[in-house]
Amino acid sequence: LFNVLTGIYAADAGELVFDGKRIDGFKPHRVAQHGIARTFQNIRLFSSMTALENVMVGRHLRTRTGVLGAVLRTIAEEQAIVQRAHELLDYCGLAARANDLARDLPYGDQRRLEIARALATEPLLLALDEPAAGMNATETAALKELLERIRADGITLLLIEHDMKLVMGLSHSVTVLDYGVKIAEGEPAAVQRDAKVIEAYLGGSVS
């Protein structure tokens, strides 16, 4: 579903409409330009680039000349990109890591760096594919605080996640799929009590 939404896979049928515009058939960079950013279950950073440079790559999607147009950008434009990248690193708690290589960052920081890079595209919707995967309790708590801040700042979060404590603590609405079929949707507390959900995920019947 995430791969269809973000232009990696094409839908077999139907239309994909976001913010009143059809985006089915768009390549990932065009989807991003229309306001959808994503992170991946398996972290996809530029490991040999610094944290700052990784965020700048995301920011280039919002410039007139794109990633390959560095020679065409003015000094002022490039300075603005650098400044915004620094602001996003600070926003995500990574200001002190700006000049560190992505590969040298702790796992939790790499997760937050991927979010910072996604935010650099100025999304309306941030799609997060298992953002807490592999995190310890402390890292997950820090992630939750960051996501709550992003949501409070007006960006819609679309979350795939198996950490139910995180899901229930963050979500306004939860949709449950069982082998690709939607079996429940609604407020977190109601979905958590749903008999179909309990049976599908706990493997037993509910009286």
Language-model features: where?
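Glycine-rich phosphate-binding loops of nucleotide-dependent enzymes
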Residues: 1-207
